[in-house]
């Protein structure tokens, strides 16, 4: 897998705790995917072998990424996901804002066993993402 950033690894103990507490690991939602490091961890360590992961991201970065070269970000995400996905797992992605992606997810009537909110880091956006996701 090809990652240029690691903003996730410090979360692994918390993710392991959550995975151990879950009764069902069939449907996961991730808001904010970037290169897919958390997505890949979920695919390899949490999600059932026949589970479904929905990733929502614009793949354009935000204010905090202004000085980063994001060329190829979406392609890198796709390649990382392809490498991490197990046989019968399904990975869907909505390449849009979290607001639009979550509105679409709500209309699909899926219920998620695990939701990871890591899109925009502004308080109003995080609150909106959390409320819409649950």
Per-segment meaning from a language model:
Residues 2-134:
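S-adenosylmethionine/decaboxylated-SAM
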């Amino acid at each position: 897998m090809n990652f240029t950033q690691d903003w996730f690894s410090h979360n692994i103990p918390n993710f392991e705790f959550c995975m151990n507490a879950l009764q069902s690991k069939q449907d996961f939602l991730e808001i904010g995917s970037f290169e897919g490091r958390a997505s890949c961890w979920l695919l390899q360590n949490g999600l059932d072998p026949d589970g479904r992961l929905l990733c929502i991201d614009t793949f354009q970065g935000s204010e905090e990424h202004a000085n980063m070269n994001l060329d190829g970000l979406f392609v890198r995400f796709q390649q990382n996901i392809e490498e991490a996905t197990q046989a019968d797992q399904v990975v869907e992605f909505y390449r849009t804002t979290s607001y639009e992606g979550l509105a679409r997810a709500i209309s699909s009537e899926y219920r998620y066993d695990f939701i990871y909110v890591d899109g925009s880091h502004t308080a109003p956006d995080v609150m909106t993402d959390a409320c819409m996701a649950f």
